[in-house]
Amino acid sequence: MPRPTLLIIGCGDVGCRVLKLLQGRWRLLALTSSPERCAALRALGAVPLLGNLDEARTLGRLGALADAVLHLAPPPAAGDDDPRTRALLRALARGGRVQTLVYASTSGVYGDAGGALFDETRAVAPASARARRRVDAEAQLRWFGRRSGVRVSVLRIPGIYAADRPGGHPRERLQRGTPVLAAAEDVYTNHIHADDLARACVAALCRGAAQRVYHASDDSGLKMGDYFDLAADLCGLPRPPRITRDEAQARLSSLQLSFMNESRRLRNVRLKRELRLRLRYPTVADGI
């Protein structure tokens, strides 16, 4: 029986972890806009394809090449929609071969939930342009799945961490001494180890249901300050200073503040029951 073919769009850190998991089991293709990355992708068992989601003319052949697509590419950095996903779906529709598509979205589509614990049936309420672009991408993918019959699954992903992920370990922030909110004003955050996220991507490719959303999150359920306190203790570093929200407004960047303005806790029952994923790092204490 021939091996199925997977095309990865946006093959960065998580995509490379997926390649390692699927070597020898799938025929692997990876879209890249950088010729310099081709050798590294080949070393991981993938056939590199040069193309750019911002240049639709480079995508024409994609739809006829793969049985499944893992879409890990982010939207552009500006605007309220995602033209990259639109260009990709047009290319895939022309080929007619793709049967399965998994999209890596963000839990930011929910906006602020006031610390509530909820599952994937909660309505989206994006509070930033960054999140609105993701909501637009999800809507495009749902429409594409219904129209074409492709089995589309969406992973809504929180903060990704791993010691070997660039910028993906709290140690760097702790060493900079970046403050966190005082306990009374702190927000809940959610996390997933990069290795578990790669495994969730594979599980969704194999077992994800059509038009189904899954929270790709671990079991931690920590507030942000508690997360960094735990990381500091595990790394043997000083705990970060605590400041009020008013002080944070004056001292932190708009991007840092955006993560402090949203509080939510993600249920991951579907991830475990439907995708049958057993987390290797169920809490950040296991993975840091």
Q: What role is predicted for each listed range?
A:
Residues 15-16:
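N-terminal Rossmann-fold NAD(P) dinucleotide-binding loop
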Residues 87-129:
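Conserved Rossmann-fold NAD(P)-dependent oxidoreductase catalytic core, especially the SDR/UDP-sugar
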Residues 171-179, 186-220:
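Alpha-helical substrate-binding/gating segment
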Residues 62-103:
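NAD(P)-cofactor binding segment of oxidoreductase domains
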Residues 142-188:
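NAD(P)-dependent short-chain dehydrogenase/reductase
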Residues 47-54, 258-288:
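C-terminal amphipathic/interface module of NAD(P)-dependent oxidoreductases
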Residues 200-201, 207-256:
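Mid/C-terminal beta-alpha module of Rossmann-like enzyme folds, strongest
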Residues 114-154:
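Catalytic helix-loop patch of NAD(P)-dependent Rossmann-fold dehydrogenases
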